[in-house]
Structures are given as C-alpha cells and as structure tokens.
Amino acid sequence: MSEQNSNPLQDAAPEEIEAAMAANAADELQRLQTELAELKAKSAELADQFLRAKAEAENVRRRAEDEVSKARKFGIESFAESLLPVCDSLDAALAIQQATPEQLREGADATLRQLTSALERNKVVTINPAAGEKFDPNLHQAISMVPAQQEANTVVSVLQKGYLIADRILRPALVTVAQPQ
C-alpha cells in the first residue's frame, strides 16, 4: 500500500519532471512579469501624482509670495490717499499771502481735524489721558513724578499724545504722574 501513496513525480520519467518544472516556471515567470508590469505602472502613476502635487505646491507658494508682495506694496495706498486732503489743506494755507493769525488758527484747526479723521479711518487712535486718570504703563510713559493734590500714580498732565494702531502701541503718551504723598 505504500507504493500506491507514492509521489507521482517519483514515478515519472526525468523528461516529464523537467517539462512539468519548465511549465510551472513559465507560469510563475508570466505571473511575476505581469505583477512587475502592474507595479511599474503604479509606480509611474504615483511618481506623476507626486510631481503634479509638488508643482501645485510650488505654484501655491509663488502665488502667496506675490500676494504678500502686493499687500506690502499697496497696503499703505488707502492710508496715503486719506492723507492727501491734509496735504492739500497745508498747500492751500501756504499759498495765502496775507493771512491773519485768526485765519491761520482756523486753518490749522481744520487741518488737524482732517488729519485726525484720516488717522481714525485707518485705525490709528489717539492716547490722550485726562488729568486724574490712573497711570497705565502699557499706554503711558512717565517722564516725571510731581507732587500734586490728586491720588498717587495718576496722570497730572500730558506732554505728548500717544497713538495706537489696531490695539498696538505706536507711541505711548508722555505724561507726568502724581507722586505718592
């Protein structure tokens, strides 16, 4: 009974074994060549997708740089436009040959209002603390401390106004502060 369970290749002739192995090898070679072709195609597709994504990223970066460049170049344009009427008023004032002190004062006041309005439209806000207001080191710069008949560490006087732009200090207000008694 042991001979009936024997391996069929053991009973086959060497030529038959070689033919079977060659057929098996040919099938395996065909399968591997097909798999290799599929993997090469997938690799080429992924390489193409990578190159396209890389090119798109480069285009996005370049467009962003262009936008930033334009924003820097033209961002101040509206601010400059809002100051042009102030320049016009100053030119007109200088063109007057025989102005009285009252006229000069009125013109200066009107020009200052124009300038203040232009600054406010561009989110530049004046820091001008009132006397007696609590000293705030974030908004004020103390130039000196003076004896005063008011609470200590409060503003006595403003020597120079300060300015904020969009909640950022451009210049703190220069103030004198009441010293402790």
Swiss-Prot record:
One of the record's GO molecular function terms: protein homodimerization activity
This protein's UniProt keywords: Chaperone, Cytoplasm, Stress response
Claim: Chaperone is one of the keywords in the record: yes
Record-linked Gene3D superfamilies: 3.90.20.20, Head domain of nucleotide exchange factor GrpE
Principal subcellular localisation of the protein: cytoplasm
Location of the protein in the cell: Cytoplasm
Known function: Participates actively in the response to hyperosmotic and heat shock by preventing the aggregation of stress-denatured proteins, in association with DnaK and GrpE. It is the nucleotide exchange factor for DnaK and may function as a thermosensor. Unfolded proteins bind initially to DnaJ; upon interaction with the DnaJ-bound protein, DnaK hydrolyzes its bound ATP, resulting in the formation of a stable complex. GrpE releases ADP from DnaK; ATP binding to DnaK triggers the release of the substrate protein, thus completing the reaction cycle.
Family listed: Belongs to the GrpE family.
PANTHER family: GRPE PROTEIN, GRPE PROTEIN HOMOLOG, MITOCHONDRIAL
This protein's name: Protein GrpE
Source taxonomy: Bacteria, Pseudomonadati, Pseudomonadota, Betaproteobacteria, Burkholderiales
Gene label: grpE
